[in-house]
């Protein structure tokens, strides 16, 4: 298996989505000093994304809430989509989640509103190159720390990726053979979206009409 180098890559934010932040494993070990952990809301999907692109330690990825951002790639990078089903696309070609893809200079990464789940993760080989604070790049917007200037991404932001070498197998989004990977195993689709949620009515139930409670259930 050939080893490939990925250097001087970045992406420009064309559209930021509803709320897209840089997250890693979280800022662990500083809560006694009042430092929030931050980190991914869906740790499992984040971790799977890291593994897919060959990152052996937690590094910065994009956490996308409800609506996918649109990103224009500069250089060459490896990317994987995990978590919520936002129908990710590369150059308007829909690609499955849970598979690493190679993106080239000028490629456009995008998607739609989530069809299932709330947060999708876009992981990059090497990770997102932003300053660490207390050993983490996780964004905490209320404290305005971490990530890209301590805030969600906005249009025209240009975000660098760390240089890396990889010897993992990646797919080209244009090849028909990618459909071989579009299975339950590789495209697991996150968690089941139709699981029942059990509710115990409390004292606040009297504040709702019978019709409202019926519609909720």
Features from the language model and the residues they span:
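Conserved "landmark" site that anchors the functional core of diverse proteins
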Residues: 1-217
